[in-house]
Amino acid sequence: MGTKIIGTGVYLPKNVLTNFDLEKIVDTSDEWITTRTGIKERRIAKEETITYMATQAAKEALREANLSPEELDLIILATLTPQKRFPSTACLVQAQLKAKGVYAFDISAACSGFIYALDIADSFIKSGKAKNVLVIGAEKLSEAVDWEDRSTCVLFGDGAGAVVVTRSEDKSDILATRMYAEGSLEELLHADNCGYIRMKGRELFKVAVRSMEEVCREVLEKAGVKPEEVSLVIPHQANVRIINALAEKLNIPKEKVFVNIQKYGNTSAASIPIALHEAIKEGKVKRGDLILMTAMGGGLTWGAVLLRY
């Protein structure tokens, strides 16, 4: 019995904030942002709530999966920007989908949230407790940044991505997962008392590259897969320098690493499902391909998922 992705969906706010727009807000420049992060623009939700964005992404994923909301057994939503303290955003999405009675909860693992949630979904399916699971990563980070702090406000964007996974008897499967957390390093990336994102970029860069390389090698070894056998790496879209350094450490050519950070910035838990959806639609992922996903986020949290699409 395997866990198969049968539908993906995204929602990206229509409002685009470019680096040139940011030049008018803080002391920065397009050149400074691009050379250090790879980001050219990001989406900013104005009227859209996180519940709305997550629901739209979920509806697209369900349509592609040819499932009705009532056929779901579980909804897991990863976010660090929930709409309310409670109830969970997953419950709000459940109501919008009219998925009456479907088990729903949020998880908080920052930028690692989506792969944490996918790991949980895989466990539910393989234990026999669920057949169809909706996994969502959604963020409204524009409400969590200090727009006077040029070191962070240039990095983040809003959006949502969703996947539907189901029990499968074919070759498609989540082959290996590994998740980690290290709370003693929380000061490297955290929210301050005002709820604004604060980070120590240089220290975080080193930890991120090393930790993601190690966990990627761990899941590859667990599955008996060599790095050169991977069809596509879909990393969390945090910083193009981190992505490039990770690819170099794993000795994986850049053409086998998916990057869309230039369009959306860092969307935290939403970044990997958005990237997966785009990679599929662009023909860069096909059935039978080996896909390696990895992320690091506040916590610190990090992990990797190896799947056969």
UniProtKB/Swiss-Prot annotation:
Q: Name one GO biological process term.
A: fatty acid biosynthetic process
Ranges where the record places region ACP-binding: 237-241
Q: What is its EC number?
A: 2.3.1.180
Active site per UniProt: C111, H236, N266
Cellular location(s): Cytoplasm
| Annotated metabolic or biological route of this protein | Lipid metabolism; fatty acid biosynthesis
- Gene Ontology CC terms, in alphabetical order: cytoplasm
CDD domains attached here? KAS_III
Q: What class of enzyme is it?
A: transferase
Q: Which GO terms describe its molecular function?
A: 3-oxoacyl-[acyl-carrier-protein] synthase activity; beta-ketoacyl-acyl-carrier-protein synthase III activity
Leader sequence range is none
Sorted UniProt keywords: Acyltransferase, Cytoplasm, Fatty acid biosynthesis, Fatty acid metabolism, Lipid biosynthesis, Lipid metabolism, Multifunctional enzyme, Transferase
- Reaction(s) this enzyme catalyzes, per UniProt: malonyl-[ACP] + acetyl-CoA + H(+) = 3-oxobutanoyl-[ACP] + CO2 + CoA
Q: What does this protein do?
A: Catalyzes the condensation reaction of fatty acid synthesis by the addition to an acyl acceptor of two carbons from malonyl-ACP. Catalyzes the first condensation reaction which initiates fatty acid synthesis and may therefore play a role in governing the total rate of fatty acid production. Possesses both acetoacetyl-ACP synthase and acetyl transacylase activities. Its substrate specificity determines the biosynthesis of branched-chain and/or straight-chain of fatty acids.
* Subunit text: Homodimer.
Record remark on domains = The last Arg residue of the ACP-binding site is essential for the weak association between ACP/AcpP and FabH.
User: What's the family?
Assistant: Belongs to the thiolase-like superfamily. FabH family.
Q: What is this protein called?
A: Beta-ketoacyl-[acyl-carrier-protein] synthase III
Q: Which organism is it from?
A: Aquifex aeolicus (strain VF5)
> Per UniProt, what is the name of the gene that codes for the protein in this document?
fabH
